[in-house]
Amino acid sequence: MEFSEKWLLDWLGFSISNVFYEQMTKSGIEVEAIAKISKNFERVIVGEVVERLYVNTMHNIVFLRVKLSEKKMIFSISSNDIEFSRGTKIAIATQDSKLFNNRLISMLRFKEKISEGMVCSFKDLGILNIKNKIVEICSEVPVGTDISKFLWFDDDRIIKVSSAPNRADGMSILGIARDMSALNNLCLPTLKEYHINITNHEKFRILINIPDVCLNFIGRTIQSVNLNRQTPLWILERLRRSSISSENVLVDIINYVLIELGQPIFSFNIHGIVQNIIIRTARDNEQFFDSCSQRVPIDKRTILLSDDKEILVLGNHTNSYNSRLSLSSHNIFLGCALFNPEYINNDSHFNFGFKNKITEYYSRGVDSDIQYKALNYVTYLVLKICGGNASNVVLANSSRVTVIQKKIFVLKKTLHRYVNNIISDTLVVKYLLQLGYLVEKQKHCWLVIPPSWRFDIQIQEDVISDLVRVFGYHNIPACALVTNYKLVHDDNIYTSLNRIKLLLVDLGYNEVITYSFVDSQIQKYLFPKRKQFFLLNPISRKMSSMRLSLWNGLLSSVLYNQNRQEKVMRFFESGLCFEEDGNEYLGVKQDLYLAGVISGYKNETDWRSFNKIVSFYDLKGDIELIMALLRKLDKVSFKKMLFQNLCPKQSAAIYFEREMIGVIGVISSNISKKMGLKYKTIVFELIWKKIAQSNDYRIRDVSLYPRCSRDISIIVNDSIAADEILKVSKNVFLDKIVEVKLFDVFYGKNVGLNKKSLSLRFIFGSSKRTLSEEIISNCLNECIRILQEKFNAILRDRNFLF
């Protein structure tokens, strides 16, 4: 936000120095830059039109007699396209003047008259790039006054500030003036009340169909306005110094009030008699065309204003084609809304259409106490400049939701714990009253109600931080930090995790560290049915939600590297994730996760290997290596399970014994397309706590006797998981079978439709004796019999048929 220093001074009762701006930055409204006003002209003065003499149609100029002082009168020229009336005060450039681009004025002789000056347009002075708009001066300014003094070119500066997303008061001159007045122990500035003469008795109703979102709405109509009037120079210049260009007089007035008060005002053209103004959301298949007749996409969550027939304006103040304002508009509607920031900050609930500056004001919160005054202020300026007949203000309150000022208890012990007993009870009450709070002192606490412009004050810690701002951070003595955290030391968890990280690095993975706050839209793609936790004060929109999974950061890393022509991508990350749990503190549970992703090719291009795309089994093998290192592979299984964000036939749940500990699968094509992933991408995620806490270290003797292996091939239905067959095989004669491995899977015509051939290797051994061929054969036959009974397995080797 940018504004004129003089504009801010109008609201303050004291002078400004650089110390003031340091104080502003410390208070939470950061001063980014202070710049002097660039003046593109010199010695241009105020003159008064006395008489219009004659017109030179050939050169399209008009001669004027202009009064520069009580004793001096000159002839001046101007474009014939501009109308002049007697007594109009204008900017005059004489022979001593220097205009924009160092242009000088020369005398012009015509019909024995010599022109000694020129009427200046905004373009001549380098203020606005509008050639046929002359600079009109208000009648109170004496003739002969230097224009630069009238416009404060010599002693004004442009201030650029930014405030935190939760500070709605930092987006207006009034809000900044309030904050700085409180910090300097001065009375808070108040908005002047303007009395409006009611000369228009048109009646209409305002209906709120979304009471949870729109808390109230006020509006009025003004008839017979003249929008061809020129915006006063003092408004134009203040807008220019706020980097806002002029459109028309009504838009200029509304922008002026927006910057000064932080109050957005709806304005649109009305045709005939309006009976109802309805605040609602868009209907199914409803279309909206803006003032340029361009179609704007809207949906059932889009907030808008309509009459009984059509949409008039979107919630972001985008007028429809039929309600657009033009210089020929005579009847207008002005309105002011109070929206609930809790609903509109979350895009999944409601929106105003496309985002713009207006939506930022609404998302931060609008001061409900000055709505009526702000509407009257705009009305006053419109009537003064453009004329017209104003109606009464019509008010509509939400039927189910009212504006309730939040009551907060600030405990003395909490305050003293943070600031170490250095702010007395008397100062607490004094500072809170300075800041605009309502305060009631009680025995062990203060009951406070925040001011209407501070939507960010929610808990007692917010109030305490406000107190410290006024008291001064430099006055708080430094002391050692005291925490109430109970740290649970479980070195085994982190030792195991560090060991696994080394393994993954050896396998070609790179560790990434990403923020715990992620893009809510990407997270919605991945987990459409899971509840998200949104931040009230996000750093940016791409960091607005707490992560439910590590996949958000990993997929973003893949996308980043993919866009830089990387083709071998293997990443892993460990960190906390957050999910809803009513039994936990604040209803949020956090767990440590380990996750990984592979995408692109298996290896770099090399003469020894082919460019092979990664597959599901590549990542499954890496997970099995992790489990083997943790000595848990024999208790881990992969079971088919459907996940919305993964491909149905290439995803599985990972189980440790009977408990689900993770997920593995290929990212679905739908999500890959939305995110722009070029290659097949496979991910996994493990709840680390569930597998790291139960490490069993058992000592056993190494067998002195030789081992023997046997291979078999069986045919089973394709729907039977190989893991189930391995489990059953391992449970047969556990004291003799050392290991069972699957070393081949085969599909073919000879096997049969919906059938598959599995080749198993049995490794027999005993720690007590050497197993004879008879014992090994009996064990293997028993295992085959059980497989036949349980899975209808067919042995491919006929020597083992019964």
UniProtKB/Swiss-Prot annotation:
Catalytic activity: tRNA(Phe) + L-phenylalanine + ATP = L-phenylalanyl-tRNA(Phe) + AMP + diphosphate + H(+)
Assembly description: Tetramer of two alpha and two beta subunits.
Every FDX-ACB domain range: 703-796
Co-factor binding comment: Binds 2 magnesium ions per tetramer.
The keyword Aminoacyl-tRNA synthetase belongs to this UniProt entry's keyword annotation: yes
Pfam families tied to this protein: B3_4, B5, FDX-ACB, tRNA_synthFbeta
Spans through the membrane: none
GO biological process: phenylalanyl-tRNA aminoacylation
Domain B5: 403-478
UniProt entry tagged with the keyword tRNA-binding: yes
Domain tRNA-binding: 38-148
Name of the molecule in the record: Phenylalanine--tRNA ligase beta subunit
